[in-house]
């Protein structure tokens, strides 16, 4: 899922999650992977919830995978776990726009709405923006296929709606899955997250950590004969 902080305490929680992930990072298929464990979320956010909001992410997320597998019992358990850890009102089901032939995203969007109504978990809409506007689609496609071998990937279908939308464009795209009343709910809940963000500065003076007191020691000069040589 995705994590977003809305106050300074949340920033420090994300710092700690990031530090833990980097400490266990490893290389896989040419990329450095930095996994965050569920236990990290429980220990850092679960101990003091209310400073970070979580959402269920795109089709690559765990919850959409469970939905596409038809495992709704496990999906509900996962949602309940998220609500427990992040706190009531701090976990969101996340819909995204798609084209009419994207059956997986349509299935997930409709299932998420049903779960929203059944479990009373708030629902939002996001755009997994990889480029600025729709007119930049071909440039983005060329970039994806520019590596050696001409890998065409899934640039046309997968990234067709992966750009920033105007409200009107987004509403039109969402009509594939939702009616106007549902879209109003999606927009309103998404804006409520932005309204919760506090204004604060990350600019700080340099903070030098205090070192522990070192035990006293005596220099024995065991290598003194080599001082002048090396």
Language-model features: where?
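Phosphodiester-processing cores and adjacent nucleic acid-binding clamps
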Residues: 1-230
């Amino acid at each position: 899922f995705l994590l977003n902080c809305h106050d300074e305490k949340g920033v420090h929680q994300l710092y700690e999650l990031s530090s833990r992930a980097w400490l266990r990072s490893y290389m896989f298929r040419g990329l450095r992977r930095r996994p965050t464990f569920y236990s990290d979320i429980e220990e850092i956010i679960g101990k003091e919830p209310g400073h970070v909001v979580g959402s269920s992410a795109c089709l690559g997320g765990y919850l959409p995978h469970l939905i596409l597998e038809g495992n709704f019992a496990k999906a509900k358990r996962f949602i309940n776990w998220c609500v427990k850890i992040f706190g009531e009102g701090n976990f969101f089901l996340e819909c995204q726009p798609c084209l009419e032939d994207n059956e997986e995203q349509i299935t997930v969007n409709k299932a998420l709405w049903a779960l929203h109504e059944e479990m009373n978990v708030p629902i939002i809409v996001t755009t997994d923006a990889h480029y600025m506007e729709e007119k930049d689609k071909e440039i983005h496609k060329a970039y994806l296929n520019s590596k050696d071998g001409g890998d065409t990937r899934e640039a046309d279908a997968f990234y067709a709606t992966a750009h920033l939308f105007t409200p009107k464009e987004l509403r039109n795209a969402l009509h594939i899955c939702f009616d106007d009343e549902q879209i109003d709910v999606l927009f309103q809940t998404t804006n409520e997250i932005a309204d919760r963000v506090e204004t604060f500065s990350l600019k700080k003076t340099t903070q030098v950590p205090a070192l522990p007191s070192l035990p006293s020691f005596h220099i024995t000069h065991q290598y003194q004969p080599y001082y002048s040589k090396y």
